[in-house]
Amino acid sequence: MAINAQEISALIKKQIENFQPNFDVTETGVVTYIGDGIARARGLDNAMSGELLEFSNGVFGMAQNLESNDVGIIILGDFYTIREGDEVKRTGKIMEVPVGEALIGRVVNPLGQPIDGLGDIKTTATRPVEAPAPGVMQRKSVSEPLQTGLKAVDALVPIGRGQRELIIGDRQTGKTSVAIDAILNQKGQDVICIYVAIGQKESTVRTQVESLRKHGALDYTIVVTASASQPSPLLYIAPYAGVAMAEEFMYNGKHVLIVYDDLSKQAVAYRELSLLLRRPPGREAYPGDVFYLHSRLLERSAKLSDDLGGGSITALPIIQTQAGDISAYIATNVISITDGQIFLQENLFNSGIRPAIDAGSSVSRVGGSAQIKAMKKVAGTLRLDLASYRELEAFTQFGSDLDAATQAKLNRGRRTVEVLKQPLHKPLPVEKQVLILYALTHGFLDSVPVDQILDFEEALYDYFDSHHEDIFETIRSTKDLPEEAVLNEAIQAFKDQSEYK
C-alpha cells in the first residue's frame, strides 16, 4: 500500500488549523485556616477587595482582608465542610443578589435564596450588594409624606419619602411594632416594603411574617432574614442585600419603604468578623470603620430627582439601647447619619402609653416639609403642648394649688396623651387622624372623661363614615381641612346625639 506523503501532510495541517485549545485559566489558592465563618487562603495574589471566591464544595466567600501573604475571606454559607488544604478560586465577580417583582411576597435569605418553601424565584435581574449611593445632583429634597398610620408619628415626627428615620429604644418597647404598622399602612399606597430581620429569633421572624400575611401586607412586601443561628457574614451582608433589592424599584421610579431590624445586631456581627480577621479594635472593640458600615448603607436611601424617575427609598433603621442610653457608640453614630429619630421609652410603655414615643427626645429633621396642609394645621402646636404638659405634670406632684389656666392645660395634656395611644396593627388613614386631632385641639374632647376618650374616638369615626364621608373625601383629595364651620358643626352634631355631651 503506497503512502502519499502530501496527503498525510495536508491532513496534519488541517488538524492543526482546526485545533481548539480546551483549557480554562483560573487563579486558585489553598485554604490555610477555617473557622467561625471566616477562612484564610494563600496563593490568591490578584484577588480584589469584595470579590466573590468559590470553594471546592461550591460555597462562596467574599475577599475582605488583602494581606501580603494571604487573603482573609468571609464565608457566605456552610463552612463546616471546608477543610484546610482545600482549593479556593477567584470568580472575577462581585456579590450580587436577585432583584425584581418576582421577590415580592417571598421570604429570602441574604443571598436572595427562598426559604419559605414556595419554590424557586423566577428572575434573571441581579444587582450588586455594594453600590455607590446617589450623588448630590441625583437627589431631590423630601417633599411627599410617607404616612405610617400612627397618630404619634404622623403628627409629631412626620416621615417623608426618601427620609431615614431611626427607631431607637430599649428591648421590649415596641420598636418592631412601629415599623410593622408603618408597613401595614402602605396597603394601596403603591409603596413596596422590604423588612430585613437581622439576628432575630426564627420564631419571631415567623410571627412577623404571619402578621404581614394576615393583614394582606405580603402582597407588596419582601422579607429578608438572617436569623440568630446563622453565621456572622450573613448577618453583616443582610441589610446591603435588602437595599440592593430596594434600589431596583427606586431606579424604576417606584417608592420603597425598608426596615432594618436591627442594626445593633449587624454592628455586633461585623465586630465579630473584624476581630476574627485580626483587624485592630477601637472603642468598645468595634473596628475603626463601624461608622462607614452604617453610613454607606443609609446613604443609599434617597428621593431621586425627576430626571431619574423620582423614585425613593425611605429607611427605618432600628437600634436597641441599654437602659435608655441614647449616647452609646452605635446609637450616636446612627443618630448622626439619619434625618431624625423616634425614641421609645420603657417607662411610657409600661404605663400603658403605646406607641411609647417620647415626644421630647424624638425629632424629624425633614419630614415636616412633607406633611399635608391639614395635618400641619392641627398638629402645629401639639409638640409644644405635650412638652409643657410633661413639665406641669412634674411640677404638680409637689401638690401646690393650681389656677384655672394651669388646670385646663393639664386636662388638655391628659387627653392629648390618651388620643395619641393606638392599638397594635391598627394604623389609621390620615383623614381620621386629622379629624381626631382637630377635635382635640379645638376643645371638643375637654368635656369627655379621660377613660372614655378611645371609645369617643371610635364612635366619632363611625359617625363620620356613615354621615360625613364627604368631609373625609375633602381631606383626602385637597390635603387640606374643609371650612372650620362645617367641621365644627359636624363634630358638635355627633356630640349632641351621643352620650359624650
Swiss-Prot record:
Superkingdom: Bacteria
Pfam families registered for this protein in UniProt: ATP-synt_ab, ATP-synt_ab_C, ATP-synt_ab_N
Subcellular location: Cell membrane
Keywords, alphabetical: ATP synthesis, ATP-binding, Cell membrane, CF(1), Hydrogen ion transport, Ion transport, Membrane, Nucleotide-binding, Translocase, Transport
Membrane topology: Peripheral membrane protein
Key word Oxidoreductase present: no
EC number: 7.1.2.2
Stored InterPro entries: ATP_synth_asu-like_sf, ATP_synth_asu_C, ATP_synth_asu_C_sf, ATP_synth_F1_a_nt-bd_dom, ATP_synth_F1_asu, ATPase_F1/V1/A1_a/bsu_N, ATPase_F1/V1/A1_a/bsu_N_sf, ATPase_F1/V1/A1_a/bsu_nucl-bd
Main location, first listed in the record: membrane
Binding site for ATP: G169, D170, R171, Q172, T173, G174, K175, T176
Keyword Nucleotide-binding: yes
A molecular-function term among this protein's GO annotations: ADP binding
Reactions mediated catalytically: ATP + H2O + 4 H(+)(in) = ADP + phosphate + 5 H(+)(out)
Transmembrane segments: none
Assembly, per entry: F-type ATPases have 2 components, CF(1) - the catalytic core - and CF(0) - the membrane proton channel. CF(1) has five subunits: alpha(3), beta(3), gamma(1), delta(1), epsilon(1). CF(0) has three main subunits: a(1), b(2) and c(9-12). The alpha and beta chains form an alternating ring which encloses part of the gamma chain. CF(1) is attached to CF(0) by a central stalk formed by the gamma and epsilon chains, while a peripheral stalk is formed by the delta and b chains.
Family assignment from sequence similarity: Belongs to the ATPase alpha/beta chains family.
Function text: Produces ATP from ADP in the presence of a proton gradient across the membrane. The alpha chain is a regulatory subunit.
NCBIfam families per record: atpA, PRK13343.1
Protein name per the record: ATP synthase subunit alpha
Gene: atpA
